[in-house]
């Protein structure tokens, strides 16, 4: 509707509007926008490339945020997501490099693929207990993220979910998680401690590769498989305890762990 209107800096959407369509404001010059309470959905790429947009409030009426909805909104510093949103599309806030914090409401049950990838200024994130899955690349390359609390209902951590989050120093994985995806925490070289609970059965390939800040790791009895290169080049590791039920350890799983004693 207003795609590539680069001179458009502000707009008031009337209360009669119930949905914002796909690509509606793609690559616009918007600095601010007010979304009325009548809107229930924000379409795919609706505000994609609105690089001058600094803040957005998503009202409680909105239930879904589409794929790439705010992709490359590189000036966006503040986002308030309403309490009715149940799904956030893949890469919805990807490359929002100025975004410093965000609170995800209790209505959200899953975080999609690459949802916050490349949000390089993001320092904190609150994930509610309603979230059961974190998709692949969800927080990839969020290098300023120093801490994160994973919710108690979480069952899976996707591939590359936190890779290149080199600002992370510690993380506790809740007892509900059963699988840690490949490259889930790769290149998190600021990570000094990690707790893997007894619920986890598999650790993916490269899951903790290049986490050279880790000094010790305990793999619980619940784990049956450790993927290829899972702890590759964790050169700071001096102690690893492997549970009794591991039946397969992938190739080069501990390669480059030069200080390791088992």
Write out the residue ranges for each language-model feature.
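Structural signature of tandem-repeat unit edges
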Residues: 5-19, 28-41, 51-64, 74-87, ...
């Amino acid at each position: 509707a207003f795609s590539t209107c680069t001179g458009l800096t502000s707009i008031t959407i009337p209360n009669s509007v119930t949905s914002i369509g796909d690509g509606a404001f793609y690559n616009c010059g918007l600095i601010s926008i007010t979304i009325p309470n009548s809107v229930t959905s924000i379409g795919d790429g609706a505000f994609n490339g609105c690089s001058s947009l600094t803040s957005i409030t998503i009202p409680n009426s909105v239930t879904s945020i589409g794929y790439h909805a705010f992709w490359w909104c590189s000036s966006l510093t503040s986002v308030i997501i309403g309490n009715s949103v149940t799904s956030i599309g893949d890469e919805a806030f990807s490359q929002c490099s100025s975004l410093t914090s965000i609170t995800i409401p209790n209505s959200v049950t899953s975080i999609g693929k690459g949802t916050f990838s490349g949000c390089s200024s993001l320092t904190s994130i609150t994930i509610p207990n309603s979230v059961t899955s974190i998709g692949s690349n969800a927080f990839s390359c969020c290098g300023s993220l120093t801490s994160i609390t994973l919710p108690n209902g979480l069952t899976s951590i996707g591939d590359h979910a936190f890779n290149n989050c080199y600002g992370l120093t510690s993380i506790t994985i809740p007892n509900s998680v059963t699988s840690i995806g490949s490259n889930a925490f790769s290149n998190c070289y600021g990570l000094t401690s990690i707790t893997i609970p007894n619920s986890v059965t598999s650790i993916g390939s490269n899951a903790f590769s290049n986490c050279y800040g880790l000094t010790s790791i305990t793999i619980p009895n619940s784990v049956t498989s450790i993927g290829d290169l899972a702890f590759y080049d964790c050169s700071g590791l001096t102690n690893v305890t492997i549970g009794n039920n591991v039946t397969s350890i992938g190739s080069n799983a501990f390669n480059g762990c030069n200080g390791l004693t088992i």
